[in-house]
Amino acid sequence: MIPEIIASLEYGVAVLGIKVLLVLGHSNCGAVKAAMNAGTVPGQISALYQYLQPAVAKSDGNIDKATEVNARFQAELLRASSTVIRDAAKAHQLKVTAGVYDLATRKVRLSELPYLE
């Protein structure tokens, strides 16, 4: 993740005192589909592929699984990349979790991450 994104989230945690960070994917995600197919896309969109590849590799070709795995991976990456986020999570002052929004049902399915010790 780029420093500007992490810094924005750290601000929410350290300054605003937010209690939950939710990394949310969504069903039928075009970026996940494109990464799975290694399709050609305009501009710099393909730069996202490298961040999606760990999830794609573990998805067995299933887009729903890739989307959920990616959301979990990105949430775990947040905790690993930021001492502010990691320390707040360890102190049980912050819950970092992942989920997938289903466009058809308009429901979110959460995918819990273990607490840090």
Feature map (PLM): residue ranges:
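Divalent-metal-activated hydrolytic enzyme cores
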Residues: 1-19, 30-117
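Conserved functional hotspot residues or short segments at active or partner-binding sites
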Residues: 23
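Active-site cofactor/cluster-binding pocket
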Residues: 26-27
